[in-house]
C-alpha cells in the first residue's frame, strides 16, 4: 500500500532523524546514569535533567506536540503524516517524552483540547502542552478485567 506523506511530514522526518542522532541517542547513557543515581538515592521518580535539557531544545526547534491533529500551539498534522514521526520517535525509550508525545499525555491532551472548557484547558491542557506536568489515565469497573478502555461496559 503506498501512502504519500505531505511535504511537512517528510521534512519533519528528516529533522527528527537528525535530532535523534544529535541529541537523543547520545543522551540515553546519561539518562540511564541519572536514573541509576536517583534509584540509589531512594528517589527514582524524578525527571532526569538530561530530559529537561533536551525538551527545551526540541521545543526551540519546533519538534514539540506534533501528535495533535488540531494543535492549539501550532500547526496541525494528520494521523497519516504523524505515523512515520511516531515510528522514528519509537526508536528511543526517551524520545517521546523529549518531544512531548508520551502516552497517556497525548490522548489526554487530545481529549482536553476537544472537550474541556476554558477553565479546564487553562488548568490542565496548557501545562501539559508546555511539558510542565504529566497526566494519568485510570479506569475501573466491576466485572471488567482489562486496562483496555474499549472494554468498558458502563454507559
Give the location of each predicted region:
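Short, glycine/charge-rich beta-strand/loop segments that flank catalytic centers
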Residues: 71, 99-108, 129, 139-142
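A generic signature of intrinsically disordered, low-complexity regions enriched in glycine/proline
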Residues: 69, 85, 109-112, 152
